[in-house]
C-alpha cells in the first residue's frame, strides 16, 4: 500500500468502468463501447458518429489487448459469471478517449454511468491497462438468470 510523506496510508486509486445502469437481456451491464456499438448495429449513428466509432474502435484495438483473445473463456458465464472489464487508473491515455463515446450516448439518450472502485471484484484477467473481474457476490451459485418470458 502506498503511503504519503506523513506515513499514513494513501487512499487506493480506483479502477474505472463506464456501463449502462440497466442489465441487458443476458443479465449484464453493457459497457460504454458495447452501448455505442449497439447504436451502430441498429443504424442509429450519424455519419460523423460512425466515423468516430470506427476510428476510435480501431485505435483501442491497437492500443490494448482484447482479454478474450488472450484468455478465451474470460467472459464465459459458466466460468466467470458477470465478468466485466475495468480500466486501471494508470490507463489515462485510454480513458482520455472515452469522452467521445459518452457524448454519442448522451446525444441518443442512452444512460451510461461512471463507476470507480478500489476493489471491483475477483480478478480473472489482468494486463497493464485493465482488469477483468467477477463482481463480488457473483459466482456460479449467484449468477443472474433472466426470467423466461
For the regions a protein language model found, what residue spans apply to each?
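Acidic, proline/glycine-rich low-complexity IDRs
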Residues: 103-149
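Long, contiguous N-terminal structural blocks used for assembly/anchoring
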Residues: 1-85
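Intrinsically disordered, low-complexity boundary segments flanking structured domains
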Residues: 1-6, 99-100, 118-122
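Extracellular-facing segments of soluble proteins and assemblies that are Gly/Ser/Thr-biased and enriched
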Residues: 87-111
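Intrinsically disordered, low-complexity segments used for protein-protein interactions
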Residues: 14, 89, 132-134
Amino acid at each position: 500500500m502506498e503511503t504519503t510523506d506523513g506515513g499514513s496510508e494513501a487512499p487506493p486509486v480506483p479502477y474505472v468502468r463506464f456501463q449502462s445502469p440497466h442489465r441487458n437481456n443476458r443479465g449484464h451491464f453493457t459497457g460504454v463501447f458495447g452501448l455505442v456499438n449497439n447504436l451502430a448495429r441498429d443504424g442509429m449513428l450519424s455519419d460523423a458518429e460512425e466515423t468516430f466509432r470506427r476510428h476510435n474502435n480501431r485505435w483501442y484495438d491497437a492500443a490494448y489487448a482484447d482479454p478474450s483473445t488472450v484468455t478465451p473463456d474470460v467472459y464465459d458465464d459458466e466460468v466467470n459469471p458477470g465478468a466485466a472489464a475495468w480500466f486501471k487508473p494508470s490507463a489515462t491515455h485510454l480513458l482520455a478517449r472515452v469522452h467521445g463515446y459518452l457524448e454519442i450516448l448522451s446525444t441518443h439518450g442512452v444512460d451510461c454511468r461512471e463507476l470507480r472502485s478500489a476493489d471491483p471484484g475477483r480478478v480473472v484477467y489482468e494486463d497493464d491497462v485493465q482488469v477483468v473481474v467477477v463482481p463480488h457476490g457473483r459466482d456460479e451459485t449467484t449468477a443472474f438468470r433472466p426470467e423466461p418470458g
